[in-house]
């Protein structure tokens, strides 16, 4: 992409639960899936059209653009590291903090399938994968 950013694509259907600036994560968006799983995308450059707290999103929808924001208390700081996307997946556990799940295998699956927009949400991945 000419501007040096890449699209950030939602891995799930759900609702934008949180977004905005975090000192470490920079511009970020958090999606709560219909099954309660929380998907976290951080270090974003910008948000996509219509992405706001409470908005409904679908798997494959562009959430915004990948960037290098964060690692500063100064809102909007970027360039302290290379452009990348920090992805977190958190499964709710009754009576405890959400369980952090390594997104590696989901991302490998999507990469292996050459998926450019998510064809499956995390909850719908074939059992054989």
Regions found by a protein language model. Give the residues of each.
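Short alpha-helical segments in extracytoplasmic peptidoglycan/chitin-binding modules
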Residues: 41, 63, 86
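Zn2+-dependent peptidoglycan hydrolase active-site motif and core
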Residues: 3-5, 10-53, 74-83
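Short regulatory "switch" loops immediately downstream of catalytic or recognition motifs
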Residues: 65-73, 89-93
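Acidic, glycine-rich catalytic/binding loops that coordinate metals and/or anionic ligands
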Residues: 80-129
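A structural signal for short beta-strand/turn segments enriched in small hydrophobics and glycine
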Residues: 14-16, 54-69
């Amino acid at each position: 992409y000419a501007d040096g950013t890449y699209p950030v694509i939602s891995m799930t259907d759900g609702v934008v639960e949180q977004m905005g600036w975090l000192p470490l994560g920079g511009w970020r968006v958090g999606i709560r899936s219909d099954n309660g799983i929380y998907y976290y995308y951080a270090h974003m450059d910008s948000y996509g059209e219509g992405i706001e707290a409470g908005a409904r999103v679908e798997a494959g929808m562009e959430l915004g653009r990948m960037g290098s924001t964060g690692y500063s208390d100064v809102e909007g700081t970027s360039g302290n590291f290379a452009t990348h996307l920090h992805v977190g997946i958190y499964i709710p556990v009754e009576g405890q903090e959400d369980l952090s799940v390594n997104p590696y295998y989901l991302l490998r699956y999507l990469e292996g399938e050459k998926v450019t927009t998510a064809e499956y949400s995390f909850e719908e991945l074939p059992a054989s994968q």
